Amino acid sequence: MNTDWNSPQGDFDTAEKQGELLMLLSRQQVTVHTWDDPDFDYMEEQDLALVVQSPSGTEDLLIELCGEFSVFFEKWHGEYAATAEDYAQLQQDITAILDGKAGALSLYTENGWQGTVLCTELPGAEDATAAAALKRCWQEAKPDTVLPAGSRLELVCWDPAQNRKYQLPEE
C-alpha cells in the first residue's frame, strides 16, 4: 500500500497534465501557484495549484495537482485519482462548472452546514420544480443523508445569476 500521499496515486504524475488543464482553461484567467507562494505553503515542493479567477469576483475555482487531483468550488471538494477515467471526469466536472451546467449544492439544517455535492442538474430560473430538482440532486449524491423538514438548500454557480436558495417546507 502506498502511504506517500504526495507521490502519484494512479497511472501518471498529475503534473504531467498541467499543460492540458491550462489549455482546457484557456478562456479563463488562471494563476499558477507552487509551495513557495504564501497561501500555498501547505503543498509539497512538486505540487501545483491552478486558481481560475471568477469573472464576477465571487467564488474562484481551485485545482490542485498533488498525488491526486483535487478541485474546490465554494464548499464542494472533489478528488480524482491520476487515472485516465478520473482525469476524464475531472475535465468534465470543471467544464460543467465553468459552462454553468453544474454548481455546488449545500445543505444547511438547524445544526448548520451538513455538506456539499456537485449538482449537474441545474433548474432554470422559472423552473417551478427547482426545489424538487435540487432535492433530487442531493439525494442522488448522498442517498443516506436525510433532508429534514425546514432545512435549506443553497446552490452556488460560476455565474452568480444562477445561484438559488430553497427552504424545504416544514412538515
Enumerate the language-model features and the residues they cover:
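N-terminal domain-onset segments
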Residues: 1-47
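Short secondary-structure capping micro-motifs at structural edges
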Residues: 48, 57-59, 74-82
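Amphipathic, interaction-prone secondary-structure segments
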Residues: 32-69
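Long, charged/polar, surface-exposed segments that mediate recognition or autoinhibition
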Residues: 69, 75-106
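Alpha-helix boundary/N-cap detector
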Residues: 9-12, 16, 81, 85, ...
